[in-house]
Curated annotation (Swiss-Prot):
Belongs to the tRNA pseudouridine synthase TruA family. It comes from Ralstonia nicotianae (strain ATCC BAA-1114 / GMI1000). This is tRNA pseudouridine synthase A. Its EC number is 5.4.99.12. GO terms for biological process: tRNA pseudouridine synthesis. Homodimer.
Length: 274
């Protein structure tokens, strides 16, 4: 039996999330259907992180166990032949038995792409979040970036946890949080050990409230300390949320995540300011 890891990219707007559902309109369902067509047998997958409906992935990782002997590119080419245009296998690699897509991961990175202005941008529908503002007004990116820094470190993130979250503990570690502005765009990058259900979208709801001037930057710390979902802003839309990368120990030698997206290219250079 061989364990195979696959790197997956998908447009979440086309699906009802990652996890398999009876109606079959999920990323897991179409991926496993494609694997079954390619391999001729059912190949259940285990994913690094389940994404919600409308959430995209640039660097999702899954593993599967199989008795089939195929070279890595055969897994890529063969599976992609049966996938819709909204999903693609980017790489495949044979892994040791102790590799686990979820439990071996020590870091996950999410991006959020947000645009603002007097009207929505139809060509970005499903690909970016949006905030409608009167002409001449903008989001306060500096305040948003300042507010996000309170989230760094190990904290109880109950205030940002969905009611239906199944995680055993609300305590997670955030390694970095960054907010950058480019014209009528705001980009957010959050890196952490793991995330609760709706956690990033609930954080975004608070950041948007701060960016619009409805709350001061210090409010984020109050929300975090409250450990109460009712203290935070409403859950923000999924459209602009991307699972950008899943990090593993170097010993596994997994391929680097592909160039994430033209939306984010160059945004988070080390010396860029808010």
């Amino acid at each position: 039996m061989t364990r195979i890891a696959l790197g997956i990219q998908y447009d979440g707007a086309a699906f009802s999330g990652w996890q398999s559902q009876p109606h079959g309109n999920t990323v897991q369902d179409v991926l496993e259907a494609a694997l079954r067509e390619f391999a001729g047998v059912a190949l259940p997958t285990t994913v690094a992180g389940r994404t919600d409906a409308g959430v995209h992935a640039l660097g999702q990782v899954v593993h599967l166990d199989t008795e089939l002997v195929r070279d890595p590119f055969s897994w890529v080419r063969g599976t992609n032949a049966f996938l819709p245009p909204t999903v693609a296998v980017r790489w495949a690699q044979a892994m040791p038995e102790d590799f686990h897509a979820r439990f071996s991961a020590h870091r996950r990175t999410y991006y959020y792409a947000l645009t603002y202005g007097p009207t929505r941008a139809p060509l970005l529908e499903g690909k970016a979040g949006y905030v409608t503002l009167p002409p001449g007004q903008s989001l306060d990116v500096t305040a948003m970036h300042e507010a996000a820094q309170v989230l760094v470190g190990e904290h109880d993130f109950s205030s940002f946890r969905a009611a239906e979250c199944q995680a055993k503990s609300p305590v997670k570690t955030m390694y970095s949080t960054e907010v950058r502005g480019q014209g009528e765009w705001v980009f957010v990058r959050i890196r952490g050990s793991a995330f609760l259900h709706h956690m990033v979208r609930n954080i975004m709801g608070c950041l948007v409230a701060i960016g619009r001037g409805k709350r001061p930057a210090a409010w984020m710390g109050e929300v975090l300390a409250a450990r109460d979902r009712k203290a935070a802003a409403p859950t923000f839309m999924p459209d602009g949320l991307y699972l950008a990368e899943v990090g593993y120990p170097d010993a596994f030698r997994l391929p680097a995540s592909p160039a994430s997206s033209s939306l984010f290219r160059g945004v988070f250079d080390e010396h860029a300011g808010p």
